[in-house]
Regions:
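Alpha-helical transition-metal enzyme core signature, strongest for iron centers
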Residues: 10-24, 40-58, 101-104, 124-138
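Residue-level recognition of alpha-helical structural elements
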Residues: 6, 32, 36, 90-93, ...
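Carboxylate-rich helix-loop segments that flank metal/cofactor sites and access channels
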Residues: 56-90
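N-terminal leader/targeting segments
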Residues: 2-4
Length: 148
């Protein structure tokens, strides 16, 4: 489905954040390593804050919505199917978390370039940049700490 209006983009932004938070909750229950568990709890907490941020951003910018159609964003490009991704051990869980972070980073980066409202674009860029930081932290967990 094309995300061709400000409302559709904000709705999908809220949805993708909610899905990611729910996925993190599932990963937390599977994590064995306490450092990984804490990292996943931090990421889930961040998602709750991002949900509030998206609601506030939508509310504050609704009067400035530009009715000009937005092109080039499609929901299908940001769908990830985690059913086929192994989740047997902590290393697998880190990989899943990285897939989730990459997905959200890509969406917010792409959306920031398409949204015609500077305030919203700036918010989206910040969310995308934070995802890049999160990926670095997860990469560090996966490479430099024993996870079992």
């Amino acid at each position: 489905m094309a995300l061709s209006t400000f409302g559709a983009i904000m709705g999908y932004a809220a949805e993708i954040i909610k899905q990611t938070e729910e996925a993190y909750q599932g990963l937390i229950s599977k994590a064995k390593n306490s450092t990984l568990k804490q990292a996943l709890q931090d990421l889930a907490g961040e998602e709750k804050k991002n949900q509030s941020l998206m609601e506030r951003t939508r509310r504050e910018n609704v009067t400035e919505m530009i009715l000009e159609p937005i092109t080039g964003l499609h929901q299908e490009e940001y769908i990830v199917d985690l059913k086929g991704v192994p989740q047997k051990d902590d290393t697998d869980l880190v990989k899943v978390a990285m897939i989730l972070e990459e997905r959200v980073k890509r969406f917010f980066s792409d959306a920031s370039a398409k949204v015609p409202l500077p305030e919203v674009a700036r918010t989206f860029r910040k969310v995308s940049q934070k995802r890049e930081e999160n990926l670095g932290k997860l990469q560090g967990l996966r490479l430099h700490q024993p996870l079992k």
